[in-house]
Amino acid sequence: MEKVFEKLMYASRWIMAPIYLGLSLILFALGIKFFQEIFHLIPNIFEIAEVDLVLITLSLIDITLVGGLLIMVMFSGYENFVSQLDVGESSEKLNWLGKMDAGSLKNKVAASIVAISSIHLLKVFMNAENIANDKIMWYLLIHITFVLSAFAMGYLDKITRK
């Protein structure tokens, strides 16, 4: 009975596989939004103000960072919790595949969230005259929370690996 239970529990990790695959649909949706922004920008490129161009650029960088975060979570999560990715040893293979454990993934995700939050905060500051001061304060507090959390997670990971 115990062996059957353990095999069933071990096999249940495959429930995560379609979830990781589903994240690729979100990645596809981000790609659509990315190019939608560019297609809206191109016809108006000569009329758009410099500040607005910078804000659009920051939005595109934000989308790119979220996409990179998704790829990192999809591949590392699949490798750590479901099965090893067998993509061969071609020159296209990402050099970090198979080398990122759950702790490293957690730290990279935290760093990515801080980077995404930084871009978002920069967009808020560039548009500060249109945003209430209390909202700016909350954006800043949330960003500081992300930074401190990432630092604490990295520090805890460092002291537990010793």
Curated annotation (Swiss-Prot):
Its main location: membrane. It comes from Shewanella denitrificans (strain OS217 / ATCC BAA-1090 / DSM 15013). The chain crosses the membrane at residues 15-35, 53-73, 136-156. It is found in: Cell membrane. GO terms for cellular component: plasma membrane. It is a multi-pass membrane protein. Belongs to the UPF0114 family. The keyword Membrane applies. Keywords: Cell membrane, Membrane, Transmembrane, Transmembrane helix. NCBIfam families: HI0507. InterPro entries: UPF0114, UPF0114_bac. This is UPF0114 protein Sden_0436. It holds the Pfam family UPF0114.
